[in-house]
Regions:
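Unchanged
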Residues: 47, 56-59, 64, 90-176
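Conserved Nudix-box catalytic region and its N-terminal flanking loop in Nudix hydrolases
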Residues: 2-10, 14-17, 49-52, 58-103, ...
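Acidic pyrophosphate-coordinating catalytic loop
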Residues: 25-29, 122-134, 190-191, 271-275
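Conserved beta-strand segments that form the floor/walls of ligand-binding pockets within enzyme
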Residues: 70, 85, 104-106, 117-118, ...
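Extreme N-terminal tail/first-helix region
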Residues: 1-28, 192-199
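Acidic, metal-coordinating catalytic segment for phosphate/diphosphate chemistry
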Residues: 18, 22-59, 65
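Intrinsically disordered, low-complexity, mixed-charge
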Residues: 192-284
Length: 284
């Protein structure tokens, strides 16, 4: 088996890199794909590396408009106990992290969401797995009913943000991905200023959405730009005081009367010191 199942090297010139020589699959089960490789070490010696190949996963922090969070209670067989954790699951073949998050939120919690904030990516078991988990927060929840997979059993409970933090401090929540996701979400909420990219999909072109968004952002004294995209969506970069940005994002869920916003994807963006005022940009 000559092909390398690991992600591409982040830095080909890393002096600490271990170079794969070859390897084999030693176990291919329903869940686990276990590999054993031979690799050259930085000093030229050889070593064996055993690890699990993982398709990737997504976690969703579902948040009601009043701030309550949806958490699952689910039995985890290896630990012989139930855990409190946010909805999460593996990516299906050919599925993006966002598509997987939308699917998992419906299947496990029974909700659709209009607003999707990408919190970041974590690597939970860097010593023996390729697993990477993309973390999202989802708002604008609408109940549609859960669609659990066969053999999947769980209970849904709700926490406030302080209540969930208290449960972590007390040791009642120990799931690492849930702790990381809450920390990133809390950091977003606590930040005094925002810089974010928005992608708005739905019936948003040809109905004045772009011009409406520009006026709304200018009234909120935000900096940035907005433009139509060839794929039919509207893209914006907004930068400014957190409460003003959040009000603008909430307003974007409605938009002008003739539009129909299906989804807003939000991703943190570097602060652009050159942004002044709010302007229209050419379509991409």
């Amino acid at each position: 088996m000559n092909s390398d199942p690991r992600p591409a090297a982040a830095s080909p010139d890393d002096p600490l890199a271990e170079r794969r020589i070859g390897g084999e699959r030693v176990y291919d089960g329903t869940l686990l794909d276990v590999r054993r490789d031979r690799a050259t070490m930085p000093d030229g010696s050889e070593a064996v590396r055993e690890y699990i190949v993982h398709p990737g996963a997504v976690l969703v922090v579902p948040v009601h408009d009043d701030g309550r969070m949806i958490v699952e209670r689910q039995f985890r067989y290896p630990h012989n106990r139930s855990f409190l954790e946010f909805p999460a699951g593996k990516l299906d073949p050919g599925e993006s992290a966002l598509e997987s998050g939308v699917r998992e939120l419906i299947e496990e919690a029974g909700f659709r969401a209009q607003l999707w904030l990408r919190l970041g990516t974590i690597h939970p078991v860097i010593s023996y797995s390729t697993e990477a988990i993309v973390l999202y927060a989802a708002r604008g929840l609408v109940h549609v009913g859960a669609r659990l997979d066969p053999g999947e059993f769980l209970e849904l409970v709700e926490y406030t943000e302080p209540g969930l933090q208290e449960a972590i401090d007390a040791g009642r929540v120990t799931d690492a991905k849930t702790i990381a996701a809450l920390a990133l979400y809390s950091r977003w909420n606590a930040a005094p200023a925002r810089s974010a990219r928005l992608r708005i999909t739905g019936r948003v072109q040809g109905v004045g959405y772009r011009d409406w968004a520009m006026r709304a952002a200018a009234l909120a004294q935000l900096h940035g730009w907005v433009r139509n995209r060839r794929d039919g969506s509207v893209e914006a970069h907004v930068q400014g005081e957190s409460r003003a940005c959040d009000r603008f994002i909430d307003d974007c869920r409605e938009g002008p009367r003739a539009c129909r916003v299906e989804r807003i994807e939000i991703e943190r963006a570097p602060v652009d010191a050159a942004l002044a005022g709010f302007r229209l940009e050419r379509s991409d």
